[in-house]
Amino acid sequence: MLKQRKETPKSSDLPIYLFKQGNNQEAYRYFGAHLCEQNGEAGVVFRVWAPHAKAVSIVGDFNSWTPGEHPMEMVTDGIWERFVPGIKQFDVYKYCITTPADELVYKADPYAFHTETRPSNGSKVYDIEGYEWGDAAWIKDEQKRDVINSPMSIYELQ
């Protein structure tokens, strides 16, 4: 069942405020691609933070990867949003960002719940509501671990 689209948050709303402070631990619930319904039409609302972009659009198989066909609107402080009707689960997409130097850069969604298998790197629309997590044993073991004196892994992502 598709969720009803909520109003676009104002810059003073708590999730946006916490995001700006670096304290929104559930930013994934707002940013990324979310299946929903708007005015009775099923589709996806996309949100991304691109504070220095001149423009952002959504590209994918659904628009033949055409920049500008689905332009996003900056709703507040570098947060861009767009509802696109007709997009379904597993549809592949990227953000096409126009830089201040007018270059087009294609970026995967940093909040994507699903991605293509390498060497491809597109994001996929995926609804995690109702997903059955299978990590209860790991979480139980993790709660017993001494995090201060245990080794840690650091990954560099580009």
Spans of model-derived segments:
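The feature marks proteins involved in alpha-glucan
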Residues: M1-E41, M74-E156
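Structural beta-strand segments of beta-rich domains
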Residues: A42-F46
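Terminal peptide-recognition signature
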Residues: V48, L157
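Short proline/glycine-enriched turn/loop motifs at strand-loop junctions of beta-rich domains
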Residues: W49-V56
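Solvent-exposed serine/threonine-rich low-complexity stretches and specific carbohydrate-binding patches
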Residues: P67-V75
